[in-house]
Amino acid sequence: MGSKGAYRYHWQSHNVKHSGVDDMVLLSKITESSIVENLKKRYMDDYIFTYIGSVLISVNPFKQMPYFGEKEVEMYQGAAQYENPPHIYALADSMYRNMIIDRENQCVIISGESGAGKTVAAKYIMSYVSRVSGGGPKVQHVKDIILQSNPLLEAFGNAKTVRNNNSSRFGKYFEIQFSPGGEPDGGKISNFLLEKSRVVMRNPGERSFHIFYQLIEGASPEQKQSLGITSMDYYYYLSLSGSYKVDDIDDKRDFQETLHAMNVIGIFSEEQTLVLQIVAGILHLGNISFKEVGNYAAVESEEFLAFPAYLLGINQDRLKEKLTSRQMDSKWGGKSESIHVTLNVEQACYTRDALAKALHARVFDFLVDSINKAMEKDHEEYNIGVLDIYGFEIFQKNGFEQFCINFVNEKLQQIFIELTLKAEQEEYVQEGIRWTPIEYFNNKIVCDLIESKVNPPGIMSILDDVCATMHAVGEGADQTLLQKLQMQIGSHEHFNSWNQGFIIHHYAGKVSYDMDGFCERNRDVLFMDLIELMQSSELPFIKSLFPENLQADKKGRPTTAGSKIKKQANDLVSTLMKCTPHYIRCIKPNETKKPKDWEESRVKHQVEYLGLKENIRVRRAGYAYRRVFQKFLQRYAILTKATWPVWRGDEKQGVLHLLQSVNMDSDQFQLGRSKVFIKAPESLFLLEEMRERKYDGYARVIQKTWRKFVARKKYVQMREEASDLLLNKKERRRNSINRNFIGDYIGMEERPELQQFVGKREKIDFADTVTKYDRRFKGVKRDLLLTPKCLYLIGREKVKQGPDKGVVKEVLKRRIEVERILSVSLSTMQDDIFILHEQEYDSLLESVFKTEFLSLLAKRYEEKTQKQLPLKFSNTLELKLKKENWGPWSAGGSRQVQFHQGFGDLAILKPSNKVLQVSIGPGLPKNSRPTRRNTVTSRGYPGGTKNNYPMRAAPAPPGCHQNGVIRNQFVPPPHAFGNQRSNQKSLYTSMARPPLPRQQSTGSDRLSQTPESLDFLKVPDQGVAGVRRQTSSRPPPAGGRPKPQPKPKPQVPQCKALYAYDAQDTDELSFNANDIIDIIKEDPSGWWTGRLRGKQGLFPNNYVTKI
């Protein structure tokens, strides 16, 4: 019985199940219902990301998803959007690359309601940018601060609400600053409207800020003793809402993360202790209660004064005095006098709460300031901004804080509308682009209702006016505000009032605000008495948190909380408008916070108010990309010689020349007055792909030239270092002691089937096909790869079942981390056999390039372990076998390899039971060293004398390897030994093991540079239009006359390539199977001179046949 779920594929594999559409621009029907249905399909299949053009839609999965690891970072780094499934890494990579290439600041605006996943999205962006950007220790320090700022600010600024277990109760705009090279070398955080009232009051079922619970759960016994920490229900402020624990939050572990974050950011341990003292002091402050004595407030139990006074470094009596009374200044007849006013119980509670809120807010500002100082740089160059701000929220009772939060979200929605709907359509008109307008709701009318100054004044202006005229009056101010609102804006279509407050018709729906406390919270005044109290602290750190000049601050009207948030919101909008914006629209699928729970009506509501339908319609009817002519030319100039390095003519004509050079259909773009507009993303991807290929081609040329320069410069040094490993310990081969080191003997660049086993960015130091001997001493071929981290042995096996049954595929046989190698054993003779010793079992290998391999392995081993690689030389070697649980050779065991003096330069292997007998003739003395006279000079000639042939054998064609010994098909004739050069060549042919040629080839690097190979990069959906363009743009050949007869066979001798060959040096030819090569000169060494595609060079004659 077959199982439906038997085959489980990775979400990004080519055979992955498709779920809905990746980009909702491709939806066949554009309705809210079809959008919701597509999102639901993808969400249920764990696809949380979907595109609308370049806008990313993210649905909160309420669980950890598996696709945020190193594999995905490598997959999305440098990739075009269409290459991989939708992902937040694709957006982050686009921001990073555009910043570097276009030299423009970028920002991402993450919006959505509370609990939709905005904070997590921001973390993923910051984490991705940190992982893909380079840099040294200083840059790494900045990266650490960027990443560690998250847990620190979350501890002091996030809390559990009824809608979100980790809700941001503040907004932040995080600018990551970069050097011109793309390394993060600085940063800056701007924070907005911390909801400090949460310290003293909150809705039932919610918590205060995480740090209070972290301290109680995670403090050490000594800290608990010194800070007076006990159970959570002991503290009045925490017991208000009756919620202490959260299912998916570990307060004890998070406390350690918070302390670690403070260490990374550079907050001294003394300051950390004082920060925790203040946190504990706030909790103890809340336990001070008041009773009424003769209409005035008195502290109910004075013993509760002692601990907060001690923790805050203030006098206990002074604390009592400032909580129950206040100094008021009054002016009468030009004279000023202070009046001592005793407070009632309600006023005393308000004063206590005001001090607690102020302490938490000042500590939070200190932490933000500490982070900014740790990342500060002298001057700004480029930056990526990440906006993570509290989401739109509606509670049972919505007060002043919700009013401000929803106002900021209203402003963010206005930015989105301005830049994606309104501005885009207006731009088409300004640029003279053919366009059909699309209707949409512009929420500017709601923003004006809240923030307008005049005609009519907005809610915030009326609120400030009431606070100014009734600044000395506490009672009745809120009702006066409601009356003024009803009188001045009561007829506004987006405003309604009720007996205890008012309603605003926000873009996300109607919200009812309770007027209670509106004016008091808007005033946000910290009484001078409390500032004086904290300035009297014996602790300099606490004093520094209250730097006010009391005499100067008495003059002028204090700034209200509403005007502050309005200014901050408008400053934020100005900052965002200066950047190239990117958007993430977060959707909350349910209120249960459980995975796979889908509330259709809730999601549909969000889809409607986020304007996704209109966004799809504008994107579908409009142009995916627009750019100023000059910027477009600057980015794509490299595509043609006429535009590179600079276009001399009219910019518009230059843009047209570039688009025509890539054969882009005229209906895929329009040229406006100052910008180019490209319709389909595929057309843009075509340009990007060709640009990347151009840069890649030039980079390869530079890289190749540089590598050759470095290789030649270090050639002698490398050979001598390698030779030192074997000096006085092992005989050397005559024909390999002076040879060049190439490293890659199997052409890894053209071997994706081997590259799959190695990390994408892992450098391959050495690659060769070696012989590996098993427990019966039977030799099999293995590809040996060495990287800075690991050693790989790769074999081949036939697939035994499935659709690929019978196909031979590469299989990873062994992977050994470099530091796990115990030692390497070799004989003292000139053979090529060595044993890799590892804890589990050993590997017996044979490679003609053993000296080069061992020298590279020794370097990597020393880098990893700071020790020398143990090399053992003996003519009797022990081999530990792998344990197996079947067959006659089970239970592991060991084998022995014995070496004897024989004849000739080829090793003769004779297995006998558990011993392998190896005999070989004498080689060069053990004290032999490389000589400089045979080294390759800068022109590639031995000893400075011109020689047109490589210093190695012509490679053997496929199928010429038998039992680990190479049998060359080419045998030089006897007269070839007559001159020294040919004699030397023949010795190499009989001795050295060349690279293993491939049966099939994807083509050499040369072919990728020819114009023909660019045909496949055309826009995929051109179809008939492409054919029409080709037929209309050029006349029929020779006016339609019949082709002439082909030319007679040339007199120059030619040969046909039997196999593909990749050049190993600059004077060699690369060719593919079936290429026709002109033969210029034949040589008995096996290396002929020929000409192919205008290039003359050497090639191995056993790879071709004459025609």
Curated annotation (Swiss-Prot):
Residues 1034-1051 have a biased composition (Pro residues). GO terms for biological process: endocytosis; glomerular basement membrane development; glomerular filtration; hemopoiesis; in utero embryonic development; kidney development; platelet-derived growth factor receptor signaling pathway; podocyte development. Disruption phenotype: No visible phenotype at birth. Mice exhibit massive proteinuria, combined with the presence of leukocytes and hemoglobin in the urine. They develop enlarged kidneys, present damage to the glomeruli, renal inflammation and fibrosis. In the glomeruli, the thickness of the basement membrane is increased, and podocytes fail to develop normal foot processes. Its main location: cytoplasm. SMART domains: MYSc (SM00242), SH3 (SM00326). ATP binds at G112, E113, S114, G115, A116, G117, K118, T119. It is found in: Cytoplasm; Cell junction; Cytoplasmic vesicle; Cytoplasmic vesicle, Clathrin-coated vesicle. Gene3D superfamilies: 1.10.10.820, 1.20.5.4820, 1.20.58.530, Kinesin motor domain, Myosin VI head, motor domain, U50 subdomain, SH3 Domains. Belongs to the TRAFAC class myosin-kinesin ATPase superfamily. Myosin family. Interacts with CALM and F-actin. Interacts (via SH3 domain) with SYNJ1, DNM1 and DNM2. Interacts with ARL14EP. Interacts with CARMIL1. This is Unconventional myosin-Ie. The gene is Myo1e.
